[in-house]
A protein has these predicted regions:
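NAD(P)-binding Rossmann-fold cofactor-contacting core
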Residues: 142-169
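Glycine-rich adenosine-cofactor-binding loop
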Residues: 99-102, 118-138
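Rossmann-like adenosine-cofactor binding region
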Residues: 171-247
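Phosphate/diphosphate ligand-binding glycine-rich loop within oxidoreductases
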Residues: 8, 32-112
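Conserved S-adenosyl-L-methionine
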Residues: 139-144, 242-245
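Adenosine-phosphate binding glycine-rich loop
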Residues: 221-222, 226-281
Length: 281
């Protein structure tokens, strides 16, 4: 395969950023891409620090791991596999699964000086990102989460997550129909934090918003969107028009979920300011 490597070193950095672009060889070559099981086994065999996991394997990779983090277990999805180390810092071949999506969302808010413990939240969506955000928030001290979604095939998944949160955390969670706009407006006016964790706002839905108009936002509501392209969605523009001052896109979540994964792999911090500079945030 062909590989391009860019390296930036700095004595200020605990970890040097190394970026690799790799053209994956065909499945018929020696590296075992043929099954998820063999790929996971290769983490052990090659003594890798870990791996990121993408769809559709996030919900099934747990079968081949030794441990699963509590949040990943509750939300039913793993995006990071770590080869655990012994007291000497050597990888052991014992693999643990995490979900850093939720961690990244809440870390991004913390970096903005927001203490979310005890907050009331309105969350739109029941997909992988929404589920990870809800579960991590519930475990880390969010008081109430009102989840809204259209009544599609994912609605029942939202009901399952609400049940798990209520049974396993001190957070009170409720599932609601997104079609009930009066209820949505009522809950948003009573909330401290709002998050749209759907794909509405990104291509090809960049001209749409789940929120009918700016009157749904109150000025002191913290508004977040998991979409990062475009940098400003229609929903974010509505919030700013309503006078909201704390409005954030998904770039912070994307950055910090990756940095948390790297920390889990290496035990080292990454140059956050440099990464923010390169991402333009």
């Amino acid at each position: 395969c062909r590989t391009r490597v860019n390296v930036r070193s700095s004595h200020h950095c605990a970890l040097t950023p190394i970026f690799l672009m790799i053209r994956r060889p065909p499945r018929s070559t020696l590296f075992p891409y043929t099954t998820l099981f063999r790929s996971v086994q290769s983490i052990r065999a090659l003594k890798m620090l870990g791996s990121n996991i993408s769809m559709p394997n996030k919900t099934v990779v747990h079968k081949y791991l030794d441990e699963v983090d509590e949040a990943a277990k509750l939300c039913g999805a793993i995006n990071t596999v770590v080869n655990l180390r012994d007291e000497n810092g050597q990888v052991t071949g014992k693999l643990k699964g995490y979900n850093t999506d939720g961690m990244g969302y809440w870390q991004a808010l913390t970096e903005e000086g927001i203490d979310f413990k005890g907050m009331k939240m309105v969350l739109i969506g029941t997909g992988g990102a929404a589920t990870a955000i809800a579960v991590r928030g519930a475990l880390d001290g969010v008081a109430e989460i009102e989840i809204f979604n259209i009544k599609d095939k994912f609605y029942s998944r939202g009901e399952e997550i609400v049940d798990l949160i209520n049974k396993n955390t001190n957070c009170k969670a409720t599932m609601n129909d997104l079609a009930d706009k009066d209820l949505l407006k009522e809950k948003m006016h009573a909330a401290d934090l709002f998050c749209d964790a759907t794909g509405v706002g990104m291509h090809p839905l960049e001209d749409l918003s789940n929120i009918p108009d700016p009157s749904f936002f109150k000025k002191d509501l913290i508004v977040t969107d998991t979409v990062y392209a475009p940098r400003e969605t229609v929903m974010m523009k509505q919030a700013k028009e309503a006078g909201c001052e704390k409005v954030f896109n998904g770039m912070g979540m994307m950055l910090f979920q990756a940095l948390i994964a790297i920390k889990l792999y290496t035990g080292k911090d990454t140059p956050v300011d440099y990464m923010k500079e390169k991402l333009g945030i």
